[in-house]
């Protein structure tokens, strides 16, 4: 089953990191990505440009409205994602806990709806209705 790991972090904290610390942080991402690939769990992953480059799109009353910046003003902003293959939610949470930004920000894990596998979707929705797990 596929899970999307949304990576939220404070851009200002990352930008303020000394170069050697930032290099080590990014090195952690490169190593993590290679571990996922080697385990056959990597589907996709990308970093996003800084939040000031975002544009929000809405249609209200049939009219297109765009706004510079993200949808919400929060300290942590969406900075990237991994799409991973995991047996179940518990395994996806274990994968998410290894993402470097789990130490500096927040990782949101969500099951991905696969329109080609309705039975898998039902199992994922049932699993998400259960109490939260600890990793």
Annotate each language-model stretch with its function.
Residues 1-135:
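Conserved, structured core segments of small domains
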């Amino acid at each position: 089953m596929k899970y999307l790991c949304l990576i939220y972090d404070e851009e200002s904290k990352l930008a303020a990191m000394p170069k050697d610390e930032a290099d080590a942080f990014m090195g952690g991402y490169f190593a993590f990505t290679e571990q996922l690939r080697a385990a056959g769990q990597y589907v996709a992953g990308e970093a996003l440009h800084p939040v000031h480059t975002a544009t929000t799109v809405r249609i209200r009353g049939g009219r297109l409205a765009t706004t510079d910046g993200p949808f919400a003003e929060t300290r942590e902003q969406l900075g990237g994602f991994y799409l991973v293959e995991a047996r179940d939610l518990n395994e996806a949470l274990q994968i998410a806990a290894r993402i470097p930004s789990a130490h500096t920000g927040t990782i949101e894990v969500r099951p991905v709806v696969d329109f080609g596998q309705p039975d898998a979707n039902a199992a994922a929705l049932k699993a998400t209705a259960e109490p939260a797990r600890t990793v």
